[in-house]
């Protein structure tokens, strides 16, 4: 009896394996959304799977399989943050897989297993002194006043 119960538990845990995902917004590192999603077709790219996840959860977004423009209206048309002397920051949604940012668009990335972790982060790129100095740095480190209340 114990042996068959153990085997059933192992079989259920393997069949329930799914990628984990989270969406981290503008103001702090706590996820706005998180969960898991079983990938049954590994020929679908990560962009297609992102769209499926967002639609399944009813997450309001604008975008397509190669980019996400807005999640819950952020950044909307407020993606440009001017600074002194012509410097500026641009806000946008960036993705990570297993803690690293792949060097290509999301529609060119394919998950390899249901052990992967997908993370969407509202990030920024910084144009400073005539060159790009940062890319996809989490915006919660800035806490943009357009989206975040002061602490």
Language-model features: locations:
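Ubiquitin-like/PB1-type beta-grasp interaction modules and other compact soluble beta-rich domains
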Residues: 16-151
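Sec-dependent N-terminal signal peptides
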Residues: 4-14
């Amino acid at each position: 009896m114990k042996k068959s119960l153990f085997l059933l538990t192992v079989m259920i845990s393997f069949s329930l394996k799914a990628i984990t995902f989270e969406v981290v917004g503008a103001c702090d590192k706590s996820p706005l959304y998180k969960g898991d999603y079983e990938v049954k077709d590994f020929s679908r790219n990560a962009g297609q799977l992102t769209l499926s996840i967002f639609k399944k959860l009813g997450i309001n977004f604008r975008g397509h399989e190669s980019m996400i423009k807005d999640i819950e209206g952020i950044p909307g048309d407020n993606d440009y943050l001017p600074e002194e002397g012509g410097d500026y920051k641009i806000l946008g949604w960036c993705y990570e897989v297993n803690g690293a940012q792949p060097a290509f668009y999301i529609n060119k990335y394919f998950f390899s297993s249901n052990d992967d972790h997908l993370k969407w982060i509202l990030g920024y790129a910084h144009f400073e002194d005539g060159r790009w100095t940062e890319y996809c740095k989490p915006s919660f480190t800035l806490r943009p006043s357009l989206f975040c209340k002061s602490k």
